[in-house]
Each structure stands twice: as structure tokens, then as C-alpha cells.
Amino acid sequence: MAQAHRESVLAAACVRTPVNPYTKAPLTLYERELGDRPHPSASVSPRGPARTSMEVPADLESRFCKTRRCQDWVFDISDIHHSEKDYYVQVEKLKNAHLHNMEQLEKMYDRKLHLNGVHNPENEKRVAEDVYRSAWEPKSLLPAQHDHLKQSRSVSPSLAESSHESTDEDYGDSEHSVSARNKILHMWNEFTVEDYVRDSEYFSQEIAKNKTSKKSKEWSHKITIPEPFQMTVRESKKREMNIKSKSEIELENNLLKEKLEEEAECQKKFRANPVPSSVYLPLYQEIVERNEERRRFVKEKSKEILLATQKPFQFIEREERKKTLRLDLMQFSTSETSTSHFKAKPVPKSIYGTSIVERLKEEELYRGIRTHMRAQELLQSSSYPTSTLASGAHSGTKKGRCYKLKGKQEHKPKISDTIPHFQTIHENQQKRLLESKSAKHVTLCEPFQLRTSNITSHKEKIEMDIQADEENLKETRWPYKSPRASAQIHSAGTMNLRLETLSQTPRSTESSKRREYAIRKREKQRTKDYMKELEAMEQRVLNKPLLIERVAQRNALLSAEKQYLNVLHELGLCEEFVTKNGQSSSVDEHVGVREEKKIPQGESTEGTLALEDLLDDEEDDKYDCESEEAEEEDAYSTDEDHRIEEI
């Protein structure tokens, strides 16, 4: 389908490819050979003077003219030698032909306007342009160019035909324009003014001149030759005729004025002033003398300064002075210095004896006694923290939590009619709590010293262990030489020092093991409690409403309170009045059962539960919590705490 459509479009197209008439193959004219091309000389030419005896029909002749006209514009590329000069010559030829055709059209148009009686003021300009243009047109072409541009001659007839068609179209337009112009001219026929009459006469004269110029001004073989300017001749004539320009006249006038002014100044008389007497005074000589005196004074002054600062050379005296000083110093140093050799003192005998060990023991004992006495003094002067003192003082006066009934109660409680002001009580309680909170003191650590190493049982055990090691080890047996044998040579003092150092090292006992076990157990329990607290905290966080929900709840509460207050204001009530009445009504409801029974004034009110009692119970709970925390701290006590207790 697409192929059929393409073939139909190609067949119906206006542009058709050239075909060889013999082979019917698509081939352009310049690609064919010379023998295959149709020669115009063989065919019957309407332009040639000689005609054949055969008579050609009219339809064949018209068809031949059409084909001939079409063949004239066919451009044979093989004849062109592809040079720029030939190309530009051909372009110039075409341009000249086009200009010639346009001139013919203009002349025809002007002729029509002249026949219709319309004046065109541009005729003179066009005529002048024709004259100048004719000078620029080329007279003839070279024979070589004529041979190469044979086929371009057929362009002018086609242009002529197109010009005839355009003139026919322009003729219709010109008739319309001429009729409009005639109407405009007839509109001014009623006026009779001499100026217009003169213009009309001038118009008729101009038309006559144009007619004569059209007839006379035809193309002629004349060329305008430029002539040189005659400026020098003109200037010489002006000089002969004494013709001056405006600038020359002005210059002469100015010179005359200046000359007259100078002559007037020269004719004036003047008298010179006498020479002043100061001119005759010898001022210059005085200045020269003054300068010489100043120069002499400066020279003498500078000489005096130089003589004062000048000093003679004293190298020999300086060297002698140095030698004497050096000798004096040497004598002084030899007299003072005495040869003192170092001599070490002998080692005191007390070091090798047992007295030093006893003295060290005594000093250590005195130190321990002093520290013990100091600890007792500090213990007596110390006091409990304020929180524990307050709890102890309060514990003696506080009431018991649980009350046991002792049979029937003999007295009846007195119920007070007055309602306490809970807000003031709460504020007072907060103040008391803040005061007690700020009054806490920090406990200070005190030095301590354990005396477990001084126990006799431990010393005996250590000595027995040392003896067993010395007996059982292989190094102490013969024939081996052991370092322990050399230790027996040392004195008893060094042995006692070694024993003391060994006794001071901590030993693991059963009590310490039990204490460590208890500590580990408590730590495990503490970690479990901590994990439980974390889980409870996470649960609270999960159950806690979101921030948006809390904001919504708070907004709802505020809106409800605002609505409640608005209702109270509308009714003319006060918030305090409502709270008082509500509290009194609640108390009346509780007391309504016992209205008939009156309580005597002398009875006690021990059974009442006022707000103060509730607050006391809260304080008791706090003190119980503090005591539990103290117990936990005791449970987590370390060896250092036990050492402090022993001290």
C-alpha cells in the first residue's frame, strides 16, 4: 500500500527527472554524450534566414518552440571551466540585462502617465540617471567571454515577456491612480488666483520641456571626462580684483586698533620718581661680615670640643694595671684556700646492735597510743547529723501507728466544728521541709588503723609457717648451697624487721571471706532491684499519655474551669464562698449522726485525726525510709568501715 502511494505521488509530482530519449533511463542533460544530445542546427530554426522546403505543421512548430525555449536555459556544466573570473563576468552580464529591462519598464510607465496628462517631477532625475548609467555600461565583451556565455542570452527574452506582463498589470493600477488624481485636480478649478495660474503656466512649460528632452536625450557614445579644479586660477583672479574675505577684513581692523592704542600710549608724558636713599647704604657688606664672624666662632668652638674629648693612647699602662690586679687576686686566693680532704665518719655501733629495733618498736607503740587517744577524743566530741538528731528527737514524742483497743473506751472524741485551712498548713509544711533540707551537714572521713597484725596468735602462726618452709624446702639441705644459709648470719634485729613486714601484709580469714560473700550477694540483689526499677520506669513511660493528649486534657480542664467560673459570675457568687460552703456541708454530713449526743468540754480529743496527724504520719514514713536507707548502707559496708568500728 505504501509503495503504491509513493509511486502515485511520484507520478503526479510536478518535478520530473530527465530521461534519455533513446534508453529511457534517468539521466541529466550534461551527463549525456555529445552525439546523443539534440542539435539545434539540424532542426528547423525560426530565427535563421534559410528555411527548408518541407512544410512543418503548426502544432509541431509550437511544440518545437517550447522545447527550444526550454533547452536554451539548460546549463552545460562541461563547457564551464570553473574559474572565478568567468563567474563574475556572467553575474555582471545578468545584472546589466536586469537594469536594462527595468529602464524599459520605467520609460513605458512614464509614457503612460504622459499620455494620461499626469505630471511626474522625477522625470528629470531619471533622465540624468540614464545619462550617467550609460557611461558605466560595458560597451562590448571579449570574444572569449562571448563564447563562454552563449547560453545566457536566452535570459533577456524571458525577462522581456515578464516585463510585458508586469506592464499590463501596472496599467490597470495606473488607471485607478490617474482617476483619483484627476478628481483631486478638478476640486481646485473654482479658484482664480494668479499664483496658481502662474504655476499652471510653469507646469505646461515643464511638460513641453520634458517632451523635447525625451526626444533629444537618447543614448550616445559619450563618456564624461573629469577636469581638474582651477583653484589657483580663482585665487589669482581674486587678488587682481582685490576681493577680500570677511576674516581678512576683521584681521586688518584689529591690527589697526592695536597700532592706534600703541601710538596713544607713546604720546603720553610721565615723570620718574627719585632713587630712594636706602639704595646707597652698604647692606651687602654688612651681611658678608656678619657671616664671616659667625663662621669663625663656630670653628673655634668645634676645636675646643674636639680637644676636650681627645685622649692619648694608654696601652702600656693598661696592661701593667691588669698584671698587678691579677697578681693580687692570686695571692688573696692562695691565702684563703686551705687543702681540706674528705674523710668519712665511721659507722656507729648502734646500727649493728639490737637497740635500734627496740627504739623503732617503742616509737611505733607511742604513735599508736596517740592515734587511739585522738580517735577517742574525736568520737566524744563528734555528734550525729542533724537529720538523725531530728528523727531521734521526734521519735520520742511521736505517736504509735497502731492503736490497740483496751476494752471499751471510757472517753468519747471531741469533733471540732472548725475546718482547718489546708493551704496555709501545706505552705508551712513546705517551709519546714526546706529548712530541714538545707540544714544537712556532710560527714567527714576520719583516719583509722587496724591492729589485727599485732595479735599474738597471728605472729605465732607466721613464725611456724616460716620454720616449716625452711625445713621442707630442698634448697636448705646438704650438699646444696642455699641463700637461706647466709640469712642466718644476719642479726636478730633484721629478722624482727622482716617478721614485722610479713605480719603487716593482709591475710585472708574466714570472716573476710564471709564478708565478701555477703557483699557479692547484696550486689546481685541490688542489680535485680535496679532492673525491676528500669522495667517499672519503662512501663510508666509507655502508659503515660502523649504530649498532645496531655495538652488536650489540660485544655479541656481549663475550659471546664473557665465555664465554671463564668457560671459563678453570672449567678453573682464567689469561689471562696462556694469552697467554704462545700467544706462545711461535707463536715455536717459526717457529724449529722452524732448531733443529739453532746461531748463535754473536759474530755480529751486523742481519737481525732486532724491534718497535723496526717502530716506527722507522712514525716514518720520519711524517717522510716531514711532508716531503711541507712540499713542498706550498713549492709554494703566494706572492710574499711569495720576497721573504723574497731578503732
From Swiss-Prot:
Residues 243-268, 518-544 form a coiled coil. Residues 152-161 have a biased composition (Polar residues). One of its GO terms (biological process) is cilium organization. One of its GO terms (cellular component) is cytoplasm. Residues 32-55, 143-175, 504-524, 588-647 are annotated as: Disordered. Keywords: Cell projection, Cilium, Cilium biogenesis/degradation, Coiled coil, Cytoplasm, Cytoskeleton. It holds the Pfam family FAM161A_B. Residues 613-638 have a biased composition (Acidic residues). It is found in: Cytoplasm, Cytoskeleton, Cilium basal body; Cell projection, Cilium; Cytoplasm, Cytoskeleton, Microtubule organizing center, Centrosome, Centriole. The keyword NADP does not apply. It comes from the Eukaryota. Residues 510-524, 588-600 have a biased composition (Basic and acidic residues). The keyword Cytoplasm applies. Involved in ciliogenesis. Belongs to the FAM161 family. This is Protein FAM161A. It comes from Xenopus laevis (African clawed frog). The gene is fam161a.
